[in-house]
UniProtKB/Swiss-Prot annotation:
Region (Leucine-zipper): 209-237
GO annotation, biological process: cell division; chromosome condensation; chromosome segregation; DNA replication
DNA repair is among the record's keywords: no
Top-rank lineage group of the source organism: Bacteria
Function noted in UniProt: Involved in chromosome condensation, segregation and cell cycle progression. May participate in facilitating chromosome segregation by condensation DNA from both sides of a centrally located replisome during cell division. Not required for mini-F plasmid partitioning. Probably acts via its interaction with MukB and MukE. Overexpression results in anucleate cells. It has a calcium binding activity.
Compartments it resides in: Cytoplasm, Nucleoid
Subunit structure and binding partners: Interacts, and probably forms a ternary complex, with MukE and MukB via its C-terminal region. The complex formation is stimulated by calcium or magnesium. It is required for an interaction between MukE and MukB.
Similarity section: Belongs to the MukF family.
Name this polypeptide is given: Chromosome partition protein MukF
Keyword Cytoplasm: yes
Pfam families reported for this sequence: KicB (PF03882), MukF_C (PF17193), MukF_M (PF17192)
Keywords from the UniProt entry: Calcium, Cell cycle, Cell division, Chromosome partition, Cytoplasm, DNA condensation
Primary localization: cytoplasm
Length: 443
């Protein structure tokens, strides 16, 4: 039986050669085609006059700052170019007295659709598409369970899966590729913002990062909610094909649809994982830049204040501590006698390793019940509680050990969702921590 799912590569090559396709669209030509497509959608009959095309080209020419003197000639050249490349079809007859009628071709519709409608990839649109797919697969699976001859399967199972479900899957796949391009554009915008004036661009970067993370997560939740149900329906149809050698073309279509659905869902999770990694990279860069750039920012502000002094006068207050005088007699000899008596407890030496081992054992005993009882660990609260029991000189070591021990027990589910926690104060000296609640423990 002839394969009805797709043309072979040689067939496509010969088809392209026979029709002599050759595509070349400059920016102004592409803008002209998009303008024609949008204007065509507003027409009830789908037909365009040459005067309509010239008016559209005039607007494009104004946007691109092109000469008005040669407008008519350039418009005719552009129209002929689109006709030659089969973006437009031209119709004329003896009854039109030399006036031609134009219709946009399927190729023109496809190119314009890519640049116009496919940019609108929203959760609502995805939900509607998946809802249509679910209804089509449901009807196809019900028809498959009824059984029937090959003609029945072609009309009631193969046709809706081939010409409705498969096309919607292709549309979703194309939209996801547009999302990939959109992410690259956002990365370029963030890089441009950070390279110009990063301390003023932090808020804009945060907004771009959060919006993209939220969109990816929302879209993936929608895909996950529908993915398992769609796969179950496809398996339901596939089970009806057992022993039906005459329906191999349906079985091959089902396999292709399953692969497309797996690719669509896996794309979403992969996109989220990659974006989370990029998100963390940007935040690490910002934190490093802030730590390394404090003096440069102060210097910039100072230079700017000096330049604007006459417009906005200001006062500079300085403070200078008095120098300590050397009161020791140069001729006095140092006392090299050995000190006797007991050393105060504050000056007693205790090895750092002994201190750390003591703290580790205490923290392990303190955190173990959280894991045993399945209770979430709020690092901010734990750090505040434990640091209050230690002198300030040990706060850094204690905090580091607590965090190390807590991370060994598990992780926070919000970390994988690109949710950034608020800063929490952990002592009275200005120390803060930024950490999500640990609610997933290692087995």
């Amino acid at each position: 039986m002839q394969n009805e799912l797709a043309q072979t590569i040689p067939e496509l090559i010969n088809w392209t050669k026979e029709r002599e396709f050759s595509l070349s669209l400059s920016s102004d030509r592409l803008a002209f085609l998009l303008a024609i497509s949008i204007y065509n959608n507003e027409q009830t009959d789908g037909e365009l006059l040459e005067s309509d095309l010239i008016d559209l080209f005039r607007y494009v020419s104004e946007v691109f700052d092109q000469s008005e003197a040669t407008l008519t000639q350039r418009a005719n050249n552009a129209i002929n170019d689109l006709v030659k490349q089969r973006f437009l079809n031209r119709f004329s007859s003896e009854f039109t007295e030399g006036l031609a009628i134009y219709r946009i071709t399927p190729l023109g519709v496809g190119v314009a659709d890519y640049y116009v409608r496919q940019r609108e990839f929203s959760t609502l649109r995805l939900s509607i598409q998946l809802s249509i797919v679910a209804d089509e697969i449901q009807r196809a699976s019900s028809a498959a369970e009824e059984g029937g001859d090959e003609r029945f399967w072609r009309n009631n199972v193969f046709a809706p899966l081939k010409y409705s479900v498969a096309e919607i899957f292709d549309s979703i796949d194309l939209s996801q590729r547009m999302m990939d391009e959109n992410q690259h554009q956002i990365r370029e915008r963030i890089a441009e913002l950070l390279s110009q004036n990063w301390h003023e661009a932090i808020l804009s970067c945060e907004q771009l990062l959060d919006e993209t993370s939220g969109n990816l997560r929302e879209l993936q939740d929608t895909l996950n909610a529908a993915g398992d149900k769609l796969q179950a329906q496809l398996l339901r149809i596939q089970s009806c094909l057992i022993g039906r050698d005459d329906l191999d073309f349906v079985d091959q279509l089902i396999v292709n649809l399953q692969n497309k659905l797996d690719r669509i869902i896996s794309w979403g999770q992969q996109a989220i994982d990659l974006w989370i990694g990029y998100d963390r990279h940007v935040h690490k860069f910002i934190r490093t830049a802030i730590d390394m750039d404090k003096n440069r920012v102060f210097g910039q502000h100072l230079r700017q204040s000096i330049q604007d002094y006459f417009n906005a006068p200001w006062l500079l207050y300085t403070a200078k501590a008095e120098s300590l005088l050397d009161l020791r007699d140069d001729e006095t000899m140092l006392n090299e006698a050995e000190a006797v008596g007991e050393l105060p407890s504050e000056l007693e030496y205790e090895s750092l390793s002994d201190v750390q081992e003591q703290i580790i054992s205490v923290m392990q005993a303190h955190l173990a019940p959280f894991r045993a009882e399945g209770k979430p660990i709020d690092l901010g609260a734990v750090l505040r509680e434990q640091l209050a029991l230690y002198p300030q000189s040990r706060h850094f070591d204690v905090a580091r050990i607590i965090v190390d021990q807590a991370v060994k027990l598990g992780m926070a589910s919000l970390d994988s969702q690109a949710v950034y926690p608020e800063w929490q104060a952990i002592n009275d000296n200005g120390a803060e921590v930024q950490a999500n609640v640990i609610d997933q423990y290692n087995k």
